[in-house]
Amino acid sequence: MSGVFTRLVGQSAVESELVGAAWAARGDSPHGTAGTGSMTHAWLITGPPGSGRSVAALCFAAALQCTSESTPGCGQCRACTTAMAGTHADIRRVIPEGLSIGVDEMRDLVAAASRRPSTGRWQIVIIEDADRLTEGGANVLLKVVEEPPASTVFLLCAPSVDPEDIAITLRSRCRHVALLTPSADDIAQVLMERDGLAEAEARWAAAVSGGHVGRARRLATDPEARA
């Protein structure tokens, strides 16, 4: 993996799919000269806990906004760096503070997301824990997803496509990307290369983490987490 997608662990197929979509979107941006109308405006990214759903969404958002002429998601341009830092003006992240995401919050979000991008190619909305959408909140989102603004892309993150996690009608309007549970080898490699851990320690943490990257990192670096 390269660029922003180095943040993902053990998801090479997902990287290929998202990079390919970002390449295609460059010719489809409303601010480009050769739009084809083929851009999917709603995506559903699913995967088990610790697989990197929100990370994948953020990497994809960066790739869509990337201004480099090389592979989208270069990780070096201002669009990529601000996207990954959470400061890009045209990327909004919805992280639930409570147990649910209701109607009022979604209405405010949809209104803001309907504006034209100020600096980027797209106005992107990342809804982490989309499984917390209330029925009313999901209906508000469904209406805009059915007839999306030309410059807006919604990235939804949920554990699965099960109706308990995402409304069937909303799921049917989204392009689905499924993350896998990272292998112990992939997790150990990241702990060694990115966190500088010794091989034995990294492999132990990866083996007992249950495929959860964050848990493996805590087990390897925080003595209290092992108690």
How should each PLM-predicted stretch be described?
Residues 1-62, 82, 150-152, 158-227:
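Charged, glycine-rich active-site and insertion segments that engage polyanionic ligands
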Residues 18-23, 30-32, 83, 103-124, ...:
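Conserved alpha-helical scaffold flanking the Walker A/P-loop in AAA+ ATPase domains
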Residues 42, 71-74:
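Residues immediately within or flanking Cys/His clusters that coordinate Zn2+
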Residues 51, 100, 132-133, 147, ...:
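Residues immediately C-terminal
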Residues 74-80:
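Short cysteine clusters
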Residues 97-103, 130, 176:
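Flexible beta-alpha connector loops of hexameric P-loop NTPases
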Residues 103, 134-136, 164, 168:
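Conserved D-loop-proximal element of ABC-family nucleotide-binding domains
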Residues 125-128, 141, 152-159:
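Structural recognition of the conserved hydrophobic beta-strand(s) that form the central parallel beta-sheet
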